[in-house]
A protein has these predicted regions:
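Short alpha-helix in the alpha/beta-hydrolase fold that links the catalytic acid
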Residues: 98, 205, 214, 228-237
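Hydrolase active-site cap/lid region
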Residues: 159-214, 260
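An N-terminal hydrophobic leader/cap segment in hydrolases
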Residues: 18-61
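Catalytic histidine-centered segment of alpha/beta-hydrolase-like enzymes
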Residues: 251-261
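Membrane-embedded segments
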Residues: 63-140
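Acidic catalytic loop of the alpha/beta-hydrolase fold
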Residues: 223-227, 253-254
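Alpha/beta-hydrolase fold nucleophile elbow
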Residues: 145-156
């Protein structure tokens, strides 16, 4: 009898121990999820961007007066603008190098640094705040370009943000590079024990994509190990007649803008 009581007691102690460990781990993930998703890096406020092409540095006030920094690269006789949302790492110091991908094809391109990235102020807190920032930046560029000449583009984490933005506006087209079907689902594959209701970022691309009536172009590398290719295969099934899917053979997650097949197809799209 005493042995049975002892076993029950030890079982309860072990259960309590594992519960405490679980709560501690979940709490850590909850309070650090922004840093786990966004690998931001700051640049000095007096940092001078150095690119061998014409560009303008823009500072846009967000809803809470936080300053959002972006670069507008310009080309002669521009056909329009590409509003570009980059991935979860890197700043305009490096992302600006890909601007020529679009300026060489006759389009101006605006690249935004999210909060805490580069020279942008503030800290990212949640999905709603991030979407508000992006919407304000987009409306600012709409005051310079007719919206029917603006193409929204997003790479990696930026793909879900771009999809939401396009679903709430009327751009010329939407270009997605290495998109995820659902960020909620993608993050669960990385941290399966973390409850969905505690996540600050859901970014359900699959929910917003069907709402978009302008041309949609999806590019995904077949060798992508970060956001598996299957994500775009599933998104492709949701596309209507306005959708186009371009698999890029042997392409990983990084470096798509330098991919020759991507560049050739982009040339056709933007002609």
């Amino acid at each position: 009898m005493e042995v049975l009581k002892t076993l029950k007691f030890l079982t309860l102690v072990l259960l309590a121990f594992f519960v405490v460990i679980y709560v501690l781990i979940v709490s850590y993930v909850y309070f650090n999820q922004v840093e786990m998703i966004f690998q931001s890096a700051a640049l000095p406020k007096n940092y001078q961007f150095d690119y061998q092409q014409n560009f303008e540095e823009l500072n846009i006030k967000s809803f809470d007066d936080a300053n959002l920094n972006g670069l507008l690269f310009k080309t002669e006789n521009s056909k329009g603008l590409v509003f570009y949302l980059h991935g979860n790492a890197g700043t305009l110091e490096t992302w600006g190098k890909m601007a020529k991908t679009y300026t060489n094809l006759g389009y101006d391109i605006f690249i935004l640094d999210y909060r805490s990235f580069g020279k942008s102020e503030g800290e990212i807190e949640n999905e709603e705040q991030l979407n508000q920032d992006i919407s304000i930046a987009y409306k600012t560029l709409c005051s310079r370009y007719p919206e029917n000449k603006i193409i929204i583009a997003g790479y990696s984490i930026g793909s879900g943000l771009a999809t939401i933005l396009a679903s709430e506006n009327k751009p010329k087209a939407l270009i997605l590079q290495s998109p995820y079907f659902s960020f909620t689902e993608l993050s669960s594959s990385r941290v399966p024990f973390f409850p969905d209701f505690m996540k600050k970022f859901h970014l359900e691309t699959f929910e917003h994509l069907p709402k978009i009536n302008v041309p949609i172009y999806i590019f995904h590398g077949t060798d992508d190990q970060l956001i598996p290719y299957e994500n775009s295969v599933r998104l492709n099934k949701l596309l209507k007649s306005n959708g186009h899917f371009y698999p890029l053979k042997n392409q990983g997650h990084i470096g798509m803008n330098e991919n020759e097949d991507f560049q050739n197809q982009l040339k056709i799209i933007l002609q």
